[in-house]
Design a protein with these regions (language model features):
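N-terminal/domain-start alpha-helical segments
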Residues: 1-93
């Protein structure tokens, strides 16, 4: 089964993503901060990570760097309300 890690501090957004994905046959796990997300990533096998950028304890940019170090082949989809060009470019790093 395809497993997806959702890292989102807004419970409503996390629940919306979780429900939509599970209704389409995906297994999901949710973390509400970057540190919890990294721990889940390190202790489980995921095929995709969906993460907010503005997160407590460890922001999405740093989290993504840690995920890339551990497994550069796992796709990371960044969700955010940030819209500046600099923010978008930071997401590619």
């Amino acid at each position: 089964m395809y497993s997806i890690l959702i890292i989102e501090d807004d419970k409503r957004v996390a629940d919306l993503l979780k429900t939509g994905l599970e209704e389409n046959g995906y297994h999901t796990m949710v973390a509400y901060d970057g540190v919890m997300g990294l721990r889940l990533f390190q202790s489980h096998s995921f095929q995709l990570v969906i993460s907010d950028i503005i997160l407590p304890k460890l922001d999405g940019f740093e989290l993504c760097k840690e995920i890339r170090k551990a497994n550069p082949h796992i796709p990371v989809l960044m969700l955010t309300a940030l819209g500046s060009t600099d923010d978008k470019l930071d997401g590619f790093d």
